[in-house]
């Protein structure tokens, strides 16, 4: 494992869980790919053929510097570039809470990917609830921003996502709840 892979794993606790679901040598579309760290990791470890969609100039540049295929585009404009089932896996990794047209983008994700992987910070986590009860917006490893500089435009819980999933064509096949990068039982720390 090279230093870039180790750095990617250190940055995002959900990357390892996502990598477990992706099949070797598959095709992957990472929606809101940021600096391309997930695609770089999947390429190195699983030899996937990956593409990223990113709107941010710095993210696009970082992808290019890592050799990650990236298209600069706003997800809110849809995924008309891609035909149905263009990819084995379409991934929304810590992206869902940053977009306005959540249902539309989830439908597009289902359309272009044979399977979808979605990760998001759970605002229902008990420590986040406690912060709100104490009059403050939560700040944690999974929510590292203050209320005034967060890229998040949505707050959701695991149950919220489970309720929306059937409406947008998602059948949840598996799930993992993480706390500090470790898998926890479904009822222990999250709602």
Feature roles, as predicted:
Residues 1-11:
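Class I SAM-dependent methyltransferase Rossmann-like catalytic core
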Residues 9-25:
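Conserved alpha-helix/loop element of class I SAM-dependent methyltransferases that forms part
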Residues 41-78:
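Class I SAM-dependent methyltransferase SAM/SAH-binding core
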Residues 78-84:
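Short conserved loop adjoining the S-adenosyl-L-methionine
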């Amino acid at each position: 494992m090279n230093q870039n892979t180790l750095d990617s794993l250190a940055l995002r606790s959900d990357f390892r869980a996502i990598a477990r679901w992706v099949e070797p040598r598959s095709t992957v579309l990472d929606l809101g790919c940021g600096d391309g760290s997930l695609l770089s990791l999947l390429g190195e470890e699983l030899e996937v053929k990956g593409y990223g969609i990113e709107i941010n100039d710095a993210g696009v540049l970082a992808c290019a510097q890592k050799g990650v295929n990236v298209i600069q585009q706003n997800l809110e404009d849809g995924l008309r570039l891609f035909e149905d089932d263009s990819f084995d896996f379409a991934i929304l990794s810590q992206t869902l809470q940053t977009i306005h047209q959540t249902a539309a983008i989830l439908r597009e994700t289902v359309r272009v990917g044979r399977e979808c992987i979605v990760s998001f910070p759970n605002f229902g986590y008990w420590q986040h609830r406690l912060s709100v009860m104490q009059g403050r917006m939560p700040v944690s490893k999974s929510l590292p921003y203050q209320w005034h500089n967060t890229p998040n435009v949505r707050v959701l819980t695991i149950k919220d996502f489970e309720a929306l999933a059937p409406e947008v064509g998602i059948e949840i096949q598996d799930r993992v709840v993480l706390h500090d990068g470790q898998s926890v039982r479904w009822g222990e720390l999250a709602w």
